[in-house]
Amino acid sequence: MSGYTAFFNNFLGKSPNWYKLSIIVFLILNPILYFLISPFIAGWCLVIEFIFTLAMALKCYPLQPGGLLAFEAIAIGMTSPAHVKAEIMASFEVILLLMFMVAGIYFMKQLLLFAFTRLLITVRSKIVLSLSFCLSAAFLSAFLDALTVVAVIISVVMGFYGVYHKVASGNNFDDSTDITNDEKIKKDQQVLEQFRSFLRSLMMHAGVGTALGGVMTLVGEPQNLIIAEQASWGFGEFFIRMAPVTVPVLICGLITCVMIEKMNIFGYGDKLPRKVWGILAKFNRAQQQKMNRQERQKLIIQGIIGIWLVCGLAFHLAAVGLIGLSVIVLTTAFCGITSESTIGKSFQESLPFCALLVVFFSVVAVIIDQHLFGPIINYVLSASESTQLLLFYGFNGLLSAISDNVFVATVYINEAKNALHAGIISLEQFELLAVAINTGTNLPSVATPNGQAAFLFLLTSSLAPLIRLSYGKMVYMALPYTIVLTVVGLLAVEYILPGATKYFSSLGWITALPV
């Protein structure tokens, strides 16, 4: 074996050769574009290349190729280490959340699996079950972070998959097996594929549910807090101002959930195979039969900690990550988990994504330093007031689908506020634009996994390859939701929002405050 062959085999491991060559071409091309043609073009190429690594997540985890591209971008001067650090520190709460909250949810898996297994066994209608997942995710995301909600549902779905896979492989419920190996399930491949399709649809319904609920409240998404702070809105006023857009969108989103399940389109409609239902029902009975007082106490303790988790997040008693750390401490202490190796397993899911998110912040720093969104922002602000709402909504949605939601919302709300202080727009127009920015950032961005952090977390989780959920599959399955949420949101911003805002103001429900 030659040195070149050995190097090429080592580079990005078992990834396809065409993929390795693509990354090498990107690494050669970017400095040439940056130094000889245009930093602006080089910046946009980097963004497209990073999206490519996300799209190929099942070929190679995006951390390595994306990290190489980001490292090179910093090395050639497209951004600086100081700026990357500033972007990381600005989103440090999100990193804390990933480090501790996802690990905390791991230790509540027993309670979650118990509760959702009962739901899955009791509710036989796929449409009702899909609505249950979508609505519960929307409700939870209105008060909790969407990443936390998705982490909970991933944990549950992983539990379902693991139970069936063990039995289908000829093992018992308590046996330790490799759930990534399907060699022993050859005779049940059709059942397994149908089960995977069933789980994919539940995950997508829940994922979209987090967007439907997260846009409605002050605490639903990180960018909501930024927008509310700039507009001087409290919890109640934020909800009322968003309602003319978010309520019609929620209703239409739920109708979409029912229709796509009923019509068996866009990868939805597959029901839970009867054989899998039987295994899960048997698992539920076995768990109840062997449940002694100690096991019941563990469920009660996890339930109490779950109440603390919801209350702590809803009332912002501490940073999300710190509440997650408290969940780790409380569940492990009172459920008797003291082994370092067992505790270490809880961090396996979140830390690779945490590292990937830091790489993503490097790309965001390049977007800012190279002013990649500058022409779009200038065009929107130069438009007439009558078209500004639509343009703000539309371009926020477009940019949020390829970049960080928090970054896009921050840039646009700051530009809108600068225009207000410069006398370019009125206070009333600024308040309408704030709603357009918030809804535009949150709703159309369900189109792609990199549009929503929760979707990106799902795509790069260990569950995604198990249920065959790729980037392309997520985009395809999200398409009906993307169309409905975007169009209904756009129509609501244009035709319902201005009149409803005036009506709420006349009732005294909202007040225009100087900002």
Curated annotation (Swiss-Prot):
Domain of life: Bacteria
Pfam families xrefs: NhaB
Purpose: Na(+)/H(+) antiporter that extrudes sodium in exchange for external protons.
Gene Ontology cellular-component terms listed: plasma membrane
Protein family per UniProt: Belongs to the NhaB Na(+)/H(+) (TC 2.A.34) antiporter family.
Source organism (scientific name): Mannheimia succiniciproducens (strain KCTC 0769BP / MBEL55E)
Reactions this protein catalyses: 2 Na(+)(in) + 3 H(+)(out) = 2 Na(+)(out) + 3 H(+)(in)
Record's keyword annotation contains Acetylation: no
Matching InterPro entries: Na+/H+_antiporter_NhaB
Keyword terms, alphabetized: Antiport, Cell inner membrane, Cell membrane, Ion transport, Membrane, Sodium, Sodium transport, Transmembrane, Transmembrane helix, Transport
Upper lineage: Bacteria, Pseudomonadati, Pseudomonadota, Gammaproteobacteria, Pasteurellales
Disulfide bonds: none
Protein name: Na(+)/H(+) antiporter NhaB
Subcellular location per the Swiss-Prot or TrEMBL entry: Cell inner membrane
Subcellular location, principal: membrane
Topology versus the membrane: Multi-pass membrane protein
Record-annotated membrane-spanning stretches: 23-43, 44-64, 88-108, 119-139, 143-163, 202-222, 238-258, 303-323, 324-344, 357-377, 389-409, 447-467, 477-497
Molecular function per GO: sodium:proton antiporter activity
